Each structure stands twice: as C-alpha cells, then as structure tokens.
Amino acid sequence: MPKQLLLTKQVALTLAILVTAGAAIAQSGRPPPIVKVLRNNKVVPSPGAAFAPKATLLVSPNPACTDGVSYQFKEAEVTLMRGRGPLTPTKLVHRPVEDLTWMNMYRQPGDRIYVFISCKNLIAVSADGKQRSYPQPKQPQPAQPDLRTDAAKGISFSWLLLK
C-alpha cells in the first residue's frame, strides 16, 4: 500500500474519531450531565479517594444547565481497572447505592473504579416530573465499525483509589 494512501486513511480515521467524540453534546444541544460518586456521603474528588465498601452513584445536571432538569439512570457499568485495562469483569448496576465489597480481594492503591452510563440508560426528568429518554448520539452506519469513544456514547467517572 502506498505510503500516501496509508497516511490519508490514518487522517480520515482520526477525523472520524474526533467528529464522533462530541456527539453526546451536539445531539442534545446542551452539555451532558455529570456522573458523581459518593463515598461516606461525600463526593469523590477528581484526584481520587480511598476505597469505601459502599458507594452512591448520582447523575447531576451540568452546571451550565439551569432549566431544572434532573437525571436518573436505568443501568450503569462499574469496572475495576488496573493500568489501561479491566482487572475484573464489568458489573451492571441498577440502583444508586452499590455494595463494592466484591472488589476487596482485587483492589490496590493506584487502581481505578470506572463508572460508565450509556446515553440509552439515561432518563431526563423535567421540573414538572415528566420523564423522557436522554437524546441518543448518532449511530454509525451498520456496515461501519463503531469507533466512537465512551465520551460519545455516554457519561463516565473514573475514581482513582488512594491509600
């Protein structure tokens, strides 16, 4: 394969990834909601926190949105990560309060608990209590591979486990 053609394909692939990365924002015309994880009734900060056997998952409106919409989730994926990959299989969570003691025998400082909620599992609740599905990002054509990042498919939080 000629070098120029290979370079063109790489540029096209990079552009496709960049274009789809903003799909969750562009689809709804508003910033996406935010996943928050609470341990001992306190929000886990971005730099991380020590492990806690119970955690609460919340989906909060983006601070840039002031229209009174709140959010719920039907299903979240929780994965214990080490380095760049999963250390344990992903666990599906269907309620806000989750028991994390199953991670005890595997976890160590420096690992991450990765929480992902797909757009298809988000519910927007308006100020008057009406529920509606969160807008779905545009799907790739059936014959094309899905190269979208997690950020284009939903919302996530990464909890760095400290000592």
Outline where the language-model segments fall.
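Bacterial Sec-dependent N-terminal signal peptides
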Residues: 1-31
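Short, compositionally biased P/S/T/A/G/V-rich stretches that sit at domain boundaries
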Residues: 27-56
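Extended low-complexity, serine/threonine- and proline-enriched intrinsically disordered segments
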Residues: 55-91
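Surface-exposed coil/turn segments at beta-strand junctions on protein surfaces, enriched
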Residues: 71, 106-109
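Aromatic sugar-binding surface patches on proteins
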Residues: 93-101
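Long, low-complexity, acidic Ser/Pro- and Gly-enriched intrinsically disordered regions
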Residues: 102-107, 117, 148-149
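Short, aromatic- and glycine-rich surface loops/edge beta-strands on solvent-exposed regions
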Residues: 109-124
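Short beta-strand elements
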Residues: 126-163
